[in-house]
Amino acid sequence: MAQFYSAKRRVTTRQIITVEATDLDPFGQGVARHNGKALFIPGLLPNERAEVTLTEDKSKYSRGQVKRRLNDSPERVAPRCPHFGVCGGCQQQHASVALQQSSKSTALARLMKHEVNEIISGEPWGYRRRARLSLSYEPKTQKLAMGFRKAASSDIVDVKQCPVLVPHLEALLPHLRNCLSDLQGARALGHVELVLADNGPLMVLRHTAPLSAPDREKLERFSHSHELTLFLAPQSEILERVSGDDPWYLSDGLRLTFSPRDFIQVNDGVNQQMVAKAIEWLDVQPDDRVLDLFCGMGNFTLPLAQRAASVVGVEGVNALVEKGQQNAHHNALDNVTFFHENLEEDVTQQPWAQHGFDKVLLDPARAGAPGVMQHIIKLAPKRVVYVSCNPATLARDSEALLSAGYQIQRLAMLDMFPHTGHLESMVLFQL
């Protein structure tokens, strides 16, 4: 029989249960058990009990919302940022730094099946030297929204402050908002990037329509009054420097010049410790030949070259290879060779692969380094240091080395992004 009306949806009462969280996941959710499954509860910390409303019930896990928290964990702290819980930037400001680090270390140890030997961390606040803020002009209010995206949304949280930004950049926010709001072309602004180099701040403004002469003058005056380097980006691939000098930062005492488009580590303090730890773990000797894979513009390569006989850096982004070569030249390092090669392809025929090496360092992107693991084994270096931004691909790639007879000597959790779910790490493998 034909049906000419919508069938009524079956309404089920949302079940309310009482549970206790036992773990904290990377997204700041408490993890409890219910009906033999993991139950994820935003905002609940380990050892906290709560009345929870079940909001989603899948075959392997459930989700819930806290209706009433019955006790507070001693690790619960007041979030420092007024935007926490709405802004998608941070997930764990309600948890103590100690709990954040122990939760990440436990997750890393579980994946790697090895204890975490050390935690490398820095200041938990004011650490972020780079940020991209979205811009959106609201015609109804005639105001410019400037901020970060909401979690799982394209909506912008109009931020007035951001305590994880380095203080110099956070202090710029109200002045920057006023400057951009006053532009005639405020409707055509896409986003603004802020970076604090060691020689001062820089700003990249993405605009989708040509800026008027008065707007350019306002921006240039702003850059001079706040002593920052100004770049304009009329298109995603075009960058015009309007004022200021080339930005640079120090790595192991070396000056590394970079472009605003180049990748640099967001957390300078942890980056410095990470470079020093890699050098220590590799135990670089004056006669060593060292290979640095996914080398970028030389964050590890050049410090290694100060200690080794020779260093080869391999990188898939040509602009970073060119920057690495320039930085080697400017720092009078003539024992470094850079190769522009795609490390996701067959590496055995690439020119760098014909060399022999005593030590290897690799720092791949989130996808890991499955294409190079067998060749590293073939090279048979005495030590391998793997720096990772994704523990899942690190665990996968590690299996190849472990199967070839390497052993994990040291495992460190890098707290590169406090108050977020990002987990970075580094491992020393030795034959």
From Swiss-Prot:
Domain TRAM, residue spans: 8-68
InterPro entries in the cross-refs: 23S_rRNA_MeTrfase_RlmD, MeTrfase_TrmA_AS, MeTrfase_TrmA_CS, NA-bd_OB-fold, SAM-dependent_MTases_sf, TRAM_dom, U5_MeTrfase_fam
Active site: 389 (nucleophile)
Keyword Methyltransferase attached: yes
Example GO molecular function: iron ion binding
Catalytic activity: uridine(1939) in 23S rRNA + S-adenosyl-L-methionine = 5-methyluridine(1939) in 23S rRNA + S-adenosyl-L-homocysteine + H(+)
GO biological process: rRNA base methylation
Keywords (A to Z) from UniProt: 4Fe-4S, Iron, Iron-sulfur, Metal-binding, Methyltransferase, rRNA processing, S-adenosyl-L-methionine, Transferase
Catalytic activity, EC: 2.1.1.190
Top EC class for this record: transferase
Alphabetical list of Gene3D superfamilies matching this protein: 2.40.50.1070, Nucleic acid-binding proteins, Vaccinia Virus protein VP39
Residues noted as binding S-adenosyl-L-methionine in the record, renumbered to the chain: 265, 294, 299, 315, 342, 363
Binding-site positions, [4Fe-4S] cluster: 81, 87, 90, 162
Function: Catalyzes the formation of 5-methyl-uridine at position 1939 (m5U1939) in 23S rRNA.
Similarity-based family: Belongs to the class I-like SAM-binding methyltransferase superfamily. RNA M5U methyltransferase family. RlmD subfamily.
NCBIfam families: PRK13168.1, rumA
Protein's name according to its UniProt entry: 23S rRNA (uracil(1939)-C(5))-methyltransferase RlmD
Taxonomic lineage of the native organism: Bacteria, Pseudomonadati, Pseudomonadota, Gammaproteobacteria, Enterobacterales
